[in-house]
């Protein structure tokens, strides 16, 4: 059983966590238009390699992960999807609290902690967003957000086997986000952790199903379209220091 769960997580990583997660408005609150102005251009010096890996990942996604997302879409109603989305968002709150703490933003750290406590208890394990109704909102934070907070730019655009699309700054997120900085990983059973990760990945893939289908069917260059969408959305989800200026490499790809 554990092997099946691990396999599901690996497959679900192909087109969600790194590729398109940041494109979905329910996952991130895009409030950093100044960041888009600072890092408007995509630095893609490894484009030839990236395109080959993108094609490889896309085939695996079409064979394995997309059918799971389509099945999830067809077999669950909107009410259940909303509960799963709320549950997944709540599971991320301890990680968000840790990253806000690393950013020395203690107000948002405590809001994230209380949001997790309220939704886990009154919200029945996070199935209902009770905290949001009383004004306790919190934008999801990863280690990449923390690095950006201290002035680390996105760096080169990368497409990695299995992991998917990312950049030099965010490429460690799968490790730090899912394990090293996530308190739940130290206090829950391994089977529970793996099950939650699998559900989270499938939920993420479903959230971008319409977008990815449209791009793959209609875009003349799906690679460039997804690269641009991911870069813009990710840059809008991070907050750089005041007066931060994104480095401008000689060879860049404009959005």
Curated annotation (Swiss-Prot):
Residues 1-18 form the signal peptide. Keywords: Signal. It comes from the Bacteria. GO terms for cellular component: membrane. Disulfide bonds: none annotated. It holds the Pfam family MlaA. PANTHER family: INTERMEMBRANE PHOSPHOLIPID TRANSPORT SYSTEM LIPOPROTEIN MLAA, LIPOPROTEIN VACJ-RELATED. Belongs to the MlaA family. This is Uncharacterized protein RBE_1331. It comes from Rickettsia bellii (strain RML369-C).
